[in-house]
């Protein structure tokens, strides 16, 4: 070994193509597809994958974590309350107690999504960025997977047909947009699905409604995180994230209960 790096262009391309082909062949038929790699989606992915179920997370942007990175108005911290702090501690995330507030903790807004994403990956989940879910597969009155497209192709406005991923269950964890549910409602008006959207901010109400609003809203389709509050007209919360993590965990537990029967 003379210390010279090998960098053959063709070998690089072949390596990427072979690896990508094998990856796609492994994930075109899975147990759960999670749409959106924000706080609730990553949490759900971690708990589902830990139990050995094939889980794929699809994120339109090139980074995961949703709005966590920006903290509160760009300040690099978020707030988490008990008992959601246990979910972050499991991922090795450092938490600081808030003086005078026994139930509240602050966490670094960069460390949280980074470590939570790694925890989901280490558990066995596959996270794909730059992929947008443009439609759902609807068979015999049940969601049976997702229709996917490159986000770059969508942004360019090119008319190129999509591909699909089959799944037993789909989770909409796309945040305020609730985009998967919106798509189902828009394309299938006969189903009578409506998405009223979230209400204005009331942090305590919003936090406490998140787990209650986390549920299966159509056969095979679950909502968690802010998508759950958007679907059920719940309040928004701001830079407090405990409800998001608890919602993701509850969503995973609900699906696990069905799949483990």
From Swiss-Prot:
Pathway annotation: Cofactor biosynthesis; thiamine diphosphate biosynthesis
GO molecular function: iron ion binding; pentosyltransferase activity
Protein name: Thiamine thiazole synthase
Cofactor entry: Fe(2+)
Species assigned in the record: Methanococcus maripaludis (strain C6 / ATCC BAA-1332)
Disulfide bonds: none
SUPFAM superfamilies according to UniProt: FAD/NAD(P)-binding domain
GO BP terms: thiamine biosynthetic process; thiamine diphosphate biosynthetic process; thiazole biosynthetic process
UniProt-listed InterPro entries: FAD/NAD-bd_sf, Thi4_fam, Thi4_prok
Protein family per UniProt: Belongs to the THI4 family.
Entry binding sites for Fe cation: 161, 176
Cross-referenced NCBIfam families: sulfide-dependent adenosine diphosphate thiazole synthase (TIGR00292)
Residues annotated for NAD(+) binding in this entry: 40, 59-60, 67, 133, 159-161, 179, 226
Keywords, sorted A to Z: Iron, Metal-binding, NAD, Thiamine biosynthesis, Transferase
């Amino acid at each position: 070994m003379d210390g010279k790096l090998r960098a053959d262009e063709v070998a690089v391309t072949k390596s990427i193509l072979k690896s990508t082909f094998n990856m796609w062949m492994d994930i075109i038929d899975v147990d759960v597809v999670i749409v959106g790699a924000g706080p609730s989606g990553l949490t759900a992915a971690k708990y589902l994958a830990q139990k050995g179920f094939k889980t794929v997370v699809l994120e339109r942007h090139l980074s995961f974590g949703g709005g966590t990175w920006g903290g509160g108005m760009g300040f690099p911290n978020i707030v988490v309350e008990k008992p959601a702090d246990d979910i972050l501690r499991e991922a090795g995330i450092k938490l600081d107690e808030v003086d005078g507030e026994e139930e509240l903790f602050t966490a670094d807004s960069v460390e949280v999504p980074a470590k939570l994403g790694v925890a989901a990956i280490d558990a066995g989940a596959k996270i794909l960025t730059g992929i947008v879910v443009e439609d759902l597969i609807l068979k015999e009155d049940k969601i049976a997977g997702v229709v996917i497209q490159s986000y770059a192709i969508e942004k360019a406005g090119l008319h190129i047909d999509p591909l699909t991923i089959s799944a037993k269950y789909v989770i909409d964890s796309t945040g305020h947009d609730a985009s998967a549910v919106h798509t189902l409602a828009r394309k299938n008006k006969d189903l009578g699905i409506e998405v009223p959207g979230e209400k204005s901010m009331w942090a305590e109400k919003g936090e406490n409604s998140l787990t209650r609003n986390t549920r299966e809203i159509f056969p095979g389709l679950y909502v968690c995180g802010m998508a759950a509050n958007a679907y059920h007209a719940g309040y928004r919360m701001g830079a407090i994230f405990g409800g998001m993590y608890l919602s993701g965990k509850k969503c995973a537990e609900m699906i696990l209960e069905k799949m483990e029967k």
